[in-house]
Amino acid sequence: MTRSSIILGAPIQSGTHQPGCVMGPASLRTAGLIASLEALGWRIEDQGDLSIGPQEAMAHANPAVHHLAETRAWIALLAARAEAAAAQSDLPVFLGGDHSMSAGTMAGVAAHAARLGRPLFVLWLDAHPDLHSLDTTESGNLHGTPVAYACGLGDFAAYPPLAHAIDPSRLCMMGIRSVDPAEHRRILDHGIEVHDMRAIDETGVVAPLRAFIERVKAANGLLHVSFDVDFLDPGIAPAVGTTVPGGATFREAHLIMEYLCDAGVVTSLDLVELNPFLDERGRTASLICDLAASLFGRRVLDRQTRSFA
């Protein structure tokens, strides 16, 4: 039976000071994302890009916080649309946009999981844990808050009410290599599973990923994958405003996506923080499209390769 995917763009950049993420969804489409997935036999429904209207400014006790009203509106909209997309397709893909959008997408797919009576797990592929609350962020950039919000950790009275918080024990973070003190405390306090780049260097990506997937399967869970461009090493993926040296290699990233495909447990996907303004002739957008295709079933033998015989 043909599997289906809804594609939904969220050109949001209110969660960061760095302009350019607003162009992310268009860049991924231009790089051929939809054609690549259709070539793998998926039925794709591109629902275009979401938008919000003008918002009345909201103040916060933390003076660093900026664009709070816009981010709140995006979260509310994305939560509703992500819940619907998860119900209407096998593996919806949400195109960012900065990572604050995942506060909305995770809230939405968590609501969908709750309706099905199944637990939601999250694989967080990122250089950062994004575990700030509004009172702990020093930069005021709200793309650093989605995990804390989605798990109900900290004061988020200014965000939309969260109906279904994700259990922090069902998180798995990989590729982490930049953690602020407040985030570190939350990781320790809640026992969040984190595999930083040192751990990946020591064990490889498959061992922790296999163990996490076994937990998802044992619980009959749904799995949301949130993929931030800065998970990758900036040497292969320069189009991100939060580059951190020492990220995942081309092969490590493809191996993760191929392994996830083989496991058959992924039920939703974020592709976030692509900033085409910082790209080099579209190389990062093309790489992200290739990685998404690996998750959707592409293998090396699916491609035409040049023979040197």
Question: Which residues does each PLM region occupy?
Answer:
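Catalytic cores of soluble, metal-dependent hydrolases
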Residues: 2-12, 18-93, 101, 105, ...
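Active-site metal-binding loops of divalent metal-dependent hydrolases
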Residues: 12, 98-99, 127, 176-177, ...
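Active-site histidine-anchored catalytic micro-motif
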Residues: 91-160, 170, 263
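Active-site environment of divalent metal-dependent phosphoester hydrolases
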Residues: 132, 179-181, 276-278
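An alpha-beta-alpha
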Residues: 165, 169-181
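Short gly/pro-enriched beta-turn/loop segments at secondary-structure junctions
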Residues: 165-169, 187-189, 218-220
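Short, glycine/polar-rich helix-capping loops at beta-to-alpha or helix-loop-helix junctions
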Residues: 179-189
